Amino acid sequence: MQNYLTPNFAFAPMIPERASGSRVWDTEGREYIDFSGGIAVNALGHCHPALVDALNAQMHKLWHISNIYTTRPAQELAQKLVANSFADKVFFCNSGSEANEAALKLARKYARDRFGGGKSEIVACINSFHGRTLFTVSVGGQPKYSKDYAPLPQGITHVPFNDIAALEAAVGEQTCAVIIEPIQGESGILPATAEYLQTARRLCDRHNALLILDEVQTGMGHTGRLFAYEHYGVVPDILSSAKALGCGFPIGAMLATETIAAAFQPGTHGSTFGGNPMACAVGSRAFDIINAPETLHNVRSQGQKLQTALLDLGRKTGLFSQVRGMGLLLGCVLDAPYRGRASEITAAALKHGVMILVAGADVLRFAPSLLLNDEDTAEGLRRLEHVLTEFAAANRP
């Protein structure tokens, strides 16, 4: 197939054509077990019937009406997010990048309104990932994504992840916000320690700064709770959500307390497609299923099974001996002889009918459907064992 798209993506050799649940079929009719979930997006698998019905029902009512108006689907989804989180208000957008952009802009505006222009510093973590806009890629602590776009926005300090002393040294009276991923995703599925997040909360309170938690990847059930912050006993001031919020239909959201959200008065921020009725209708139905006790229980039980099985595979093949993460967001950390070769393994896995991801050069990432069942898990692991065994035999140091 001729490619007419810009070359910023390195496309896989297969072209997906249809999918159902945790199975994908390409244009040649080959079947794949999907352990990637569209990079933690397809939380209910592919083409979930309830979401298809919700989209079909809404598309016969209202597609788009502009942000001059609110709509029933937007208010319904916002109410569910508020009722099941710390937040009082929700801003809808189209992606995780936009949700984080809104969070960072709100934090700076809130600080300016309350304390004046000198309180604008943002503290973020090295190796974090918060999006692809110029602002969010600058806040993300990975120069490989931002180095080509200088001059970058200023007033951003990066500290090592999980380094409490460095965080304490960085946060001060000029800090308007600290932004953290509860689990660093793109850099290797590395969970924050409880002490680190609790220290961040305490420092923000001490210095009148806001704690922003980026739950674009960890939120919407992936860790076995609706939001990952629930594991830590820490409550943020602002939270970003996207990816699984729409289960494949583009939507993002920024959640905030009422006092902080009040800084966003009419005209201060916006989004043409934010709160789109179709996106919110799908998101609302997805929310009901994701937040159901049986779904979250499945995440925890299947996650434990998958983690145990992956550890066994790693030890059997000698490729990895550590599996990080929570629930169904997991990362296999390649042992020293195989560091830097994660992409080779994911490519080999694809050839053998299993879709997995990388999280940096050294980690194999798994973010499957929250409805993953024993049959799909077993078949995916069977295929993966063949891949890992073959790779280890061909590359034994």
From Swiss-Prot:
Cofactor(s) listed: pyridoxal 5'-phosphate
InterPro entries (UniProt xref): Ac/SucOrn_transaminase_bac, AcOrn/SuccOrn_fam, Aminotrans_3, Aminotrans_3_PPA_site, Class-III_PLP-dep_AT, PyrdxlP-dep_Trfase, PyrdxlP-dep_Trfase_major, PyrdxlP-dep_Trfase_small
CC annotations in GO: cytoplasm
Keywords assigned: Amino-acid biosynthesis, Aminotransferase, Arginine biosynthesis, Cytoplasm, Pyridoxal phosphate, Transferase
Principal place of residence: cytoplasm
Enzyme class: transferase
Annotated pathway: Amino-acid biosynthesis; L-arginine biosynthesis; N(2)-acetyl-L-ornithine from L-glutamate: step 4/4
Entry's localization field: Cytoplasm
Residues that coordinate or bind pyridoxal 5'-phosphate: 129, 214-217, 272
Molecular functions per Gene Ontology: identical protein binding; N2-acetyl-L-ornithine:2-oxoglutarate 5-aminotransferase activity; pyridoxal phosphate binding
Record text on cofactor binding: Binds 1 pyridoxal phosphate per subunit.
Biological process, per Gene Ontology: L-arginine biosynthetic process
Positions bound to N(2)-acetyl-L-ornithine: 132, 271
Catalytic activity: N(2)-acetyl-L-ornithine + 2-oxoglutarate = N-acetyl-L-glutamate 5-semialdehyde + L-glutamate
Location of N6-(pyridoxal phosphate)lysine modifications: 243
EC assignment: 2.6.1.11
Subunit structure: Homodimer.
HAMAP family tied to this protein: ArgD_aminotrans_3
Protein family membership: Belongs to the class-III pyridoxal-phosphate-dependent aminotransferase family. ArgD subfamily.
Other comments on record: May also have succinyldiaminopimelate aminotransferase activity, thus carrying out the corresponding step in lysine biosynthesis.
PANTHER family: AMINOTRANSFERASE CLASS III (PTHR11986), SUCCINYLORNITHINE TRANSAMINASE (PTHR11986:SF113)
Protein name: Acetylornithine aminotransferase
UniProt organism field: Neisseria meningitidis serogroup A / serotype 4A (strain DSM 15465 / Z2491)
Gene this protein is translated from: argD
